[in-house]
Curated annotation (Swiss-Prot):
This is Peripherin-2. Residues 335-354 are annotated as: Disordered. The chain crosses the membrane at residues 25-43, 62-80, 100-123, 265-290. Glycans are attached at residue 229. It is a multi-pass membrane protein.
Length: 354
């Protein structure tokens, strides 16, 4: 029994073809939106590439760009088929291509669905990329005189100001690295010497943070040095008082920014996928309704359209049998080639009589 069998007359077939033509051009527009989202996400990720550990995060935007291009190509082609299906003479040239095209559409929709899922599932990978990337970037904050790293101070400062964050996981991350360049340290000072000697790696560590960690909304002037020294500041207790530094780490801030963006994009891609599935189903109904016309010379006659010629169970069974036959045929061919090779390798023995 056919799955989703529908009866069509000429009027219904024309309406279906016209509706599908319109839907395909809407799908082309949806493909442009998916392409644009991928391009936008790629640009946003490139802006912060210095604070990311690897290029794996670009898999999502690259996938969106590819799906957008394929969507425009497939739906533009389908729109042409639907337009020509109103004319039997024009439709005849497309008829042999419809089955392979529908198979390609099916695989395209599977890929589109997986891309939508990846948009929701990339959070874990993105988190580890940001955590390691920010950690490495903060180490280079002081290298303002080193070629290739001189821009890192500005990058980190602008990042902390824009996203209202401080450090990787919090402001205390700055206590663990030397973020002040040796160029600006007075090595004749006893305090500087003592701090460097007290550190195993010979680094100048302070309980201070860069100016970009300061919250301008705080009524108190920014305390960015001796943050944990209560006696260094009047009426101050860093453990109980709300600090005038950003409390959120930049990893969390960036992760929230990109995750919310990708989740929104994933929702849009899912909607596009549902629309693409409805277009594919409609195109299959149009294809089968035109193929099942009893008398091609009488376009007014009724016909039947369906999604699957047999039930889902029977279709899967026949598909598995076809795959088994292909596998057996390949084995037989391989065996025949092997036998031919063995025969060719045998050379006839020639006996000479003296």
């Amino acid at each position: 029994m056919a799955l989703l069998k529908v009866k069509f007359n000429q009027k219904k077939r024309v309406k279906l073809a016209q509706g599908l033509w319109l839907m395909n051009w809407f799908s082309v527009f949806a493909g442009i939106i998916v392409f644009s989202m991928g391009l936008f996400l790629k640009i946003e990720l490139r802006k912060r590439s210095e604070v990311m550990d690897n290029s794996e995060s670009h898999f999502v935007p690259n996938s969106l760009i590819l799906m957008g291009i394929l969507s425009c190509a497939f739906n533009g082609f389908a729109g042409k088929i639907c337009y020509d299906s109103l004319d039997p003479a024009k439709f005849a040239k497309w008829k042999p291509l419809l089955k392979p095209y529908l198979a390609l559409c099916f695989f395209f929709n599977i890929l589109l669905f997986f891309v939508a899922l990846i948009c929701f599932l990339m959070r874990g990978s993105l988190e580890s990329t940001l955590a390691q990337g920010l950690k490495n970037s903060m180490k280079f904050y002081r290298d303002t005189d080193t070629p290739g790293r001189c821009f890192m101070k500005k990058t980190i400062d602008m990042l902390q100001i824009e996203f209202k964050c401080c450090g990787n996981n919090g402001f205390k991350d700055w206590f663990e690295i030397q973020w002040i360049s040796n160029r600006y340290l007075d090595f004749s000072s006893k305090e500087v010497k003592d701090r460097i000697k007290s550190n195993v790696d010979g680094r100048y560590l302070v309980d201070g943070v860069p100016f970009s960690c300061c919250n301008p909304s705080s009524p108190r002037p920014c305390i960015q040095y001796q943050v944990t020294n209560n006696s260094a500041h009047y009426s101050y207790d860093y453990q109980t008082e709300e600090l005038n530094l950003w409390g959120r780490g930049c990893r969390e801030a960036l992760l929230h920014y990109y995750s919310s963006m990708m989740s929104s994009m994933g929702a849009v891609v899912l909607l596009v996928w549902l629309f693409e599935m409805s277009v594919m189903v409609g195109l299959r109904l149009l294809h089968t309704s035109l193929e099942s016309i009893a008398n091609p010379e009488d376009p007014e006659c009724e016909s039947e359209g369906w999604i699957l010629e047999n039930s889902l169970k029977d279709t899967l069974k026949s598909a598995l049998e076809s795959l088994k036959k292909i596998g057996k045929f390949n084995q037989v061919e391989a065996g025949a080639e092997g036998a031919e090779g063995e025969e060719a390798g045998k050379t006839p023995a020639i006996t000479t009589v003296s």
